[in-house]
Curated annotation (Swiss-Prot):
InterPro entries for the chain: Mur-like_cat_sf, Mur_ligase_C, Mur_ligase_C_dom_sf, Mur_ligase_cen, Mur_ligase_N, MurE/MurF_N, UDP-N-AcMur-Glu-dNH2Pim_ligase
Protein name, per record: UDP-N-acetylmuramoyl-L-alanyl-D-glutamate--2,6-diaminopimelate ligase
GO MF assignments: ATP binding; magnesium ion binding; UDP-N-acetylmuramoylalanyl-D-glutamate-2,6-diaminopimelate ligase activity
Binding site for meso-2,6-diaminopimelate: 382, 406-409, 454, 458
GO biological process: cell division; cell wall organization; peptidoglycan biosynthetic process; regulation of cell shape
Residues that, per the record, bind ATP: 106-112
Location(s), subcellular: Cytoplasm
Keyword tags: ATP-binding, Cell cycle, Cell division, Cell shape, Cell wall biogenesis/degradation, Cytoplasm, Ligase, Magnesium, Nucleotide-binding, Peptidoglycan synthesis
N6-carboxylysine modification, residue list: 215
Keyword Thylakoid: no
PTM description: Carboxylation is probably crucial for Mg(2+) binding and, consequently, for the gamma-phosphate positioning of ATP.
Described purpose of this protein according to its UniProt entry: Catalyzes the addition of meso-diaminopimelic acid to the nucleotide precursor UDP-N-acetylmuramoyl-L-alanyl-D-glutamate (UMAG) in the biosynthesis of bacterial cell-wall peptidoglycan.
Family classification: Belongs to the MurCDEF family. MurE subfamily.
Length: 485
């Protein structure tokens, strides 16, 4: 592929340079191959310009960045926004994409919405996939990942591969980092979804306003005019999200208790608990639908309605979509029931931020006739301000609290636990996560419910720079097995 075809009109390039043959794109000098175009991106910890010599030594034919270094031995293309240039180049190098693409953003619920939207489409007969925190799920493969939104090269490579495999519908998570860093530019988004906004990533975003602005890039810049914007209407930031979508000329579909049931949106008029399911009554275009949603927690109602809106907004029949909701399966590690002891259910959930922890505990309160117990911690090298908030939430919403470790990274685990314990009055401290889970399970009695929060689907515990094998699911299974033995 000619270099001019990858860069497009993003920069003025000399004819001889524009005619260079490029055989790949890279942003990591360690994976550069002969013929690659290397993008030198400035990051929060290091500057890609430091690795230009290594990229050239590995065979890079040209470099793209925002400033040319002294003595560069290959052509350097200066662009105003190297991150966006990378995303667009990746889209041109890997051109195939599913015909229908829905992207969802928000603090919580992205993984579930992407999974639910994929499941709805599958049930309606479409070859569907989802990409996000738990990786890539498609008809032909499941590839586990760790980033909510992959880097542009990985994202466009995956889309190109699944499109060539016959996938026509894709739902993916659009994180604030991914949106702010232009990783999603070049994706032909058909519809965008917005779930909610609460405190998260304050180690990255300087203010909540900056955080929201990053989220709203989905509507302001990526979904094309005329595309659908499915927005949960029950939050303080909903009006701003709706205004952003309207200003772009999008078809706004407001969903939830304050949704537009008479028009294109979905209005939730009634919800009731039915065992571990919920009976919903909703309105869409003035018509009433009753749905038995096989998921616990009202936050899952919000996720299901955003998913339904994305499916309807991309052309699926409303009646068939609402019927499909009755067959949804929760995403791995999202308020997932993983066992029981003495009749007390045990749940694993990814909740690792204040609002998500509160919602998970509130969702499980109806199932705890006696005691609701929670085991959780907080990640190291991340927003430290949320730790006392989460401690207070746990103390207010649970009857028993055990504070443990959750990816301490380079921080001292004891210090992280202490920050949570400062506000979690009456909580116990068991640093070893497996031991904490085992202790909580051993004490369960009839009428209790246990929430193990923070890791969800994860299969590792990050200590220092090492990722040690660890799974909440496996820890629960081991604890239950030890009681049987």
């Amino acid at each position: 592929m000619k270099l001019r075809d990858l860069i497009g009109n993003d920069a003025a390039i000399e004819p001889a340079v524009a005619a260079l043959e490029v055989t790949g794109v890279a942003l990591d000098s360690r994976v550069v191959r002969p013929g690659d175009l290397f993008f030198a991106l400035a990051g929060s910890k290091t500057d890609g310009a430091r690795f230009i010599d290594a990229a050239v030594a590995a065979g890079a034919v040209a470099i793209v960045g925002d400033h040319a270094p002294d003595g560069c031995k290959v052509p350097f293309i200066a662009v105003a926004n190297p991150r966006r240039a990378l995303a667009l180049a990746a889209a041109r190098f890997f051109p195939a994409q599913p015909a229908t693409i829905a992207a969802v953003t928000g603090t919580s619920g992205k993984t579930s919405v992407a999974a639910f939207t994929r499941q709805i489409w599958e049930r309606l007969g479409h070859a569907s996939a989802s990409i996000g925190t738990i990786g890539l799920v498609s008809p032909k493969r499941t590839v586990y990942g760790s980033l909510t939104t992959p880097d542009p090269i990985a994202l466009h490579r995956q889309m190109d591969e699944i499109a060539r495999e016959g996938v026509t519908h894709l739902a993916f998570e659009a994180s604030s980092h991914g949106l702010d860093q232009y990783r999603l530019d070049g994706v032909r988004v058909s519809a965008g979804g917005f779930t909610n906004l609460s405190r998260d990533h304050m180690d990255y975003h300087p203010t909540v306003a900056h955080y929201l602005a990053a989220k709203l890039r989905l509507f302001r810049e990526l979904v094309p005019p005329g595309g659908a914007a499915v927005i949960s209407a029950d939050h303080d930031c909903s009006a701003e999200a709706i205004d952003a979508a309207k200003a772009r000329g999008l078809r706004v579909m407001a969903v939830g208790r304050n949704g537009d049931g008479a028009g294109e949106g979905i209005r939730l008029t009634e919800v009731g608990v039915d065992g571990f399911s919920q009976k919903l009554t909703v309105e869409h275009r003035g018509k009433r639908y009753v749905v038995l949603l096989p998921l616990a927690g009202e936050f899952q109602v919000e996720n299901a309605l955003v998913s339904a809106g994305l499916a309807i907004g991309t052309g699926s029949d409303a009646a068939n979509v609402f019927a499909s909701l009755e067959h949804l399966e929760g995403a791995k590690g999202r308020l997932e029931r993983v066992g029981e002891r003495n009749g007390a259910p045990i749940f694993v959930d990814y909740a690792h931020k204040p609002d998500a922890l509160a919602k998970a505990l509130q969702a499980l309160r109806p199932y705890a006739k006696r005691r609701l117990v929670v085991v959780f911690g907080a990640g190291g090298d991340r927003d430290a301000g949320k730790r006392p908030i989460m401690g207070e939430i746990a103390a207010e919403n649970a009857d028993g609290v055990i504070i443990t470790d959750d990816n301490p990274r380079s921080e001292q685990p004891e210090a992280i636990r202490a920050a949570i314990l400062a506000t979690a009055k009456g909580a116990r401290e068991i640093g070893d996560r497996a031991a904490a889970i085992r202790a909580a399970i051993e004490e369960l009695e009839q009428g209790d419910a246990l929430l193990i929060a923070g890791k969800g689907h994860e299969t590792g515990q990050i200590v220092g720079s090492e990722v040690l094998p660890f799974s909440d699911h496996e820890a629960v299974a081991a604890a239950l097995a030890s009681r049987v033995a």
